[in-house]
UniProtKB/Swiss-Prot annotation:
Membrane topology: Multi-pass membrane protein
NCBIfam families from the UniProt entry: matE
Family: Belongs to the multi antimicrobial extrusion (MATE) (TC 2.A.66.1) family.
Any one Gene Ontology cellular component term annotated for this protein: membrane
Keywords, comma-separated and alphabetical: Antiport, Cell membrane, Ion transport, Membrane, Transmembrane, Transmembrane helix, Transport
InterPro entries the record matches: MATE_fam, MATE_MdtK, MdtK-like
Compartment(s) where it occurs, according to its Swiss-Prot or TrEMBL record: Cell membrane
Protein name per its UniProtKB record: Probable multidrug resistance protein NorM
Alphabetized GO MF terms: antiporter activity; xenobiotic transmembrane transporter activity
Function: Multidrug efflux pump.
Recorded name of the encoding gene: norM
Amino acid sequence: MKETTSFSQKLKQFVLLFFPIFVTQMSLFAMSFFDTTMSGHASPTDLSGVAIGTSIWIPVSTGLTGILMATTPIVAQLVGSKKKEDVPHVVIQAVYLAICASFVVILIGFFVVSPILNGMRLEEPVERIAAQFLSIIAIGIIPLFTYTVLRGFIDALGKTRTTMIITLLSLPINVILNYLLIFGNFGFPKLGGVGAAIASTATYWCILIITVIIIQTKEPFASFNIFKQLYRPSLSSWIAFLKLGVPIGFAIFFETSIFAAVTLMMSNFSTTTIAAHQAAMNFASLLYMTPLSLAMAMTIAVGFEVGAKRYDNAKQYGLIGIGLALAFALLYSILLYFFDDQIASIYTTDAKVHHLAKEFLIFAILFQISDAIATPVQGALRGYKDVNVALIMTLIAYWIIGLPLGYILATYTEWAAKGYWIGLIIGLAFGAAFLLIRLFQVQRKYTTQNSR
C-alpha cells in the first residue's frame, strides 16, 4: 500500500489489491466447490453427507478464522503509522492463539459432533459420511488457522498477489486428490465424500508449508523476521487481539451459521431436497466470494489510511468497494436468471435434484444486492476497528429476524423448504441496511475529528 492523491489512483490501487484476493478466495472456495460437485457425481448420498458435514464445519471454521482475521487491520494500521518493529510480536502472538483455538475446537468437536448428528435423524449412510468427513477435517484445523494468521500479515502489507500464488499452487493438489480418492481412480480406494475430506486436509497442510517458506525467504516479508524470535505467550496481547477479533469472528459466524442452520433444518425434508439446496447454496456461496474479497481489500485499504490519519481517503475507498460490489451483483443476477439450467447441471445428473436446484437458484438472485452492501461495509468497519456494533446488528438481522421468519414460512405455509430461503433474503436485507447506517456514522465521526 502507498499514499494516493486522486480518485483514479485509489481505484487502480484498490483493484490491484482486490483482484489477487478474489483469485485467492475463489481458489480456496474451489476446494469446497470441487468437494461438493465431485461428491455429488459420486452419489446423492455422498453429496448429502458432505453437505451436512460442511454445514457444521464451515460456521466453526469461518467464525474462528474471522477472529484471526484481526491480524489484517492491526498490521495494516501499524504499517500505516510507521511502526514496523511491532509487527513480529503481533503475528507470533496470533499464531499462538490460532494453535490454542485449534486444540479447543478439536476437543469440543470430539464430544458434540456425534450427538448433533444423532439428533438430526439422518439416513444412516448420510450420517456416517458426515461423521467421517468431520473427523478427517479436524486434522487440518491447525494448519488452516495458522495459515489464516500468516495470510493476514501478508495481505496487510498489500502483497495480496503472494497469497494468490500460494493458493493457485495448492489448488491442483486438492483437485487431483479428490479425483483419486472420491472415485477410486488409479488403484486408490473409492471413498466418496470421505475422500473429499482427506483431499482438503492434505491441501491445508501444503498451503501452510508454502506460506512459511515464502515468509522466511522472500521480501518484503523476510525483513520483518517474523520467526526470528519466538516471543513468550502474552495474555495481554491475546486479550487486545481478541477484543477486535471476537466481534469480527462472531459477526462472520452469525452470517455463515444461519446458512448452515438452514441446511441442518433441511434434514427434515428428503435427501433430494437437501442435495438441491446444497447445490444452489454452494453456487450462491461461490458468487459471495466477490463481495467477501472486496471486503478484505477494504479492510486493508481503510486500515492503512486510518493508521496514517487520512480519513477522507479511507471514506473514498469505502465508496469504491461498495460501488464495485453493486456492479458485480447486477452481473451475477443476470447470470443466475439466464443460466440456471446450466448451473444446476454442474452439480447433479439426478433429474429431481436438478429441477429443485433451479428453483432455489432463482431465490439466490435476491441475495446479491444485500451481499453487495453488507459484506463490503463490514470490511470497511473492520478497517476502522469498529466491530462491536456490527456484531449486534448481524445477530439481530440474521438470527432474530431472518431465521425465525424462515422457519415460520417453511413450517406453516405452502412454501415449505423455499420458506427458509425467503427468510434468509429478508434477514440479509435488514443486515445490509443496519450496517450501511453504521458505516455512515463512523465515517462522519472520523471526518469530524479530522476537521478539528
